[in-house]
Amino acid sequence: MRPVAKADVGGSLGLTPWQVLHAVARGYVLAGQGMGRGLAEHWLSLKYCEALHGNRAGAMDLTDKGRTAERWYKSMQARELAVGFGLAAAEHIVRKRYPDHIVSVVDTSTILRAGWALGGAQRDKGSRPRPDFLIEAWKPGEPSKVTFVVCRGNHQKPSKRSGRTRSTTIQQLVKGAELAEGMQIGEWNSTPCLMLSTELMGQGGVVVNALQAPGEVRLPLRIPGAPGNADVEIDGKSGIPYPNAIRIPAREGRRARNVDGFQVGENDLAWFGQLLARTGAAGLTAFAGGGQNTAQYLTKHQGREHYDVPTFAATSSSHDAEIAVGGRKFVGTDHVFRMETVRIEAFSGMDADLYGLISEGHVEEYRRAAYELRSTLPSAEESRKWSGPISFHEDGTVMALSILPVRRRNAL
């Protein structure tokens, strides 16, 4: 492990609180396998609408409302906001490494359910270690590159004497390395990893600490229209071995040995590439409304049955809302909630043309179109015309808030 080089970061990372919540939502959109029928999983990010702001130094910081003393809330806040800040930083780093690519985030557990058992027979031993997320950097006509990501967070405060962080961040980074080692793609130790620990009460504001393990994994190139492309439905491979599955070669005087882990073998790389692309497509459709458009991309063990049912706006996420920004139409789902006395409408969705492609099962065509449209996202000036915070991502997704007019009920 080593610190992330300044060249990989490219200076400071400019973020708004709403972009962080957009990242939280995208990270959790498939995490519950669609079982949160009353409220789509990605709306959990909304409870942090008043938790972040810019401080006097221009850095992101917790608001007074975000600095709660409740231990259970702090634990949840550290876990979930760490996903937002960690993924935002990780995506930024991966974009710097592959500047002409689009990056997609997929929950690792959702991927692994297609072929592996996530827990052992002895339940007291807990779940098997693995990274939290996979970031796929992709460009039509080129092999995809995969990076493991582990996100952790804490509320530790820097030492008043030295300003240095205490042991919690170091422990989280070390634990992140252990989790990342629990999965291998192709040859041992070839997949790059990013371990991130977010200090929500760091010196001067929110601080994201990052370590990396170098490497590069390239998945086999898929040819649109040819066998093995991402439009083709795939089956899960349940029963892929976990015990002694990872082969560690002889090194530094130690003999070669096998250890437990999630191993994607050389012969499974093409299948894994399809699985990654299709699960990513499931996440996009779930973000825009879920339902059967999501189910088509998941295997049985990934939770397909939870989406393969009729959807109704009152009981689940439904793709029946739309907005227009900068001359572009976005379709998706919405949710109304309150912040004190103000009624707020949250919208999550996708560019209408891109959603049309992906809802019809055209993953490869979606990727070509998204790549061509990535530079045409609404500008900052166009975004300011929206009546509230709004965040766009190059994969075509959008998340926005708007204040609803006061609604008065007539007396009965």
What do these predicted ranges mean?
Residues M1-A57, A282, A286-L412:
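Nuclease-adjacent, charged terminal/linker segments that flank catalytic cores
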Residues A51-T63, G84, H92:
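Long, hydrophobic/aromatic-enriched structural stretches that serve as scaffold segments
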Residues D61-E70, S144-R152:
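Glycine-rich, often proline-containing surface loops adjacent to acidic residues and nearby aromatics
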Residues T68-G119, A180-P192, L284-T285:
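Acidic-basic catalytic patches of nuclease active cores, encompassing PD-(D/E)XK
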Residues R95-Y98, K157-E360:
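Acidic, metal/cofactor-coordinating or nucleic-acid-engaging core segments within structured domains
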Residues V105-L112, T147-C151, C193-M201:
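Extended hydrophobic secondary-structure segments that form protein cores and membrane-embedded regions
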Residues T108-G141:
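Active-site metal-binding core of divalent-cation-utilizing nuclease and nuclease-like domains
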Residues D132-A137, G141-P158:
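Conserved catalytic cores of phosphodiester-cleaving nucleases, focusing on short active-site segments
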